[in-house]
Amino acid sequence: MTMRNLSTIAVAALAMALAAGASAGNYEAGKAKAKEVCAACHGEDGNSQVPDYPKLSGQHRDYLEKALRDYKSGARKNPIMAPMAAPLTKQDIENLAEYYHAQPAALATRQ
């Protein structure tokens, strides 16, 4: 393999890695949807003060997207979250994941 071939392969691999890590979500749209749908339980920034409701801030995008898709499809059972996720579009889910992922996570404390 020549140096030119190696360079081409390296550039292609880097481009694919960057594309795979790129988010399809929109932060501002996610913020608006979070305020509308999620903030009452999870807090406006995803740092819920109620121990029964999980903190969403700082979570990985892919985890948040999968959880919401699974609540929506019924693969993940929760009588509170299923109806909350049901009306969300694919884009809503990506936007929410982008927004909550970008929020700084607060430390959980026991009281």
Model regions: which residues?
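Conserved amphipathic alpha-helical interaction elements at protein-protein interfaces in regulatory
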Residues: 3, 47, 70-73, 102, ...
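Gly/Gly-Pro-rich "capping" loops immediately C-terminal to redox-active cysteine motifs
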Residues: 27, 31, 46-73, 82-87
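N-terminal signal peptide c-region/cleavage motif recognized by signal peptidases
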Residues: 17-20
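C-terminal capping alpha-helices of c-type cytochrome domains
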Residues: 14, 76, 86-111
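Bacterial N-terminal signal peptides that target proteins for export
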Residues: 1-10
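C-type cytochrome heme c attachment motif
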Residues: 35-44, 54-55, 66-69, 94-98
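Sequence/structural segment immediately N-terminal to covalent heme-attachment motifs in c-type
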Residues: 25-45, 59, 108-111
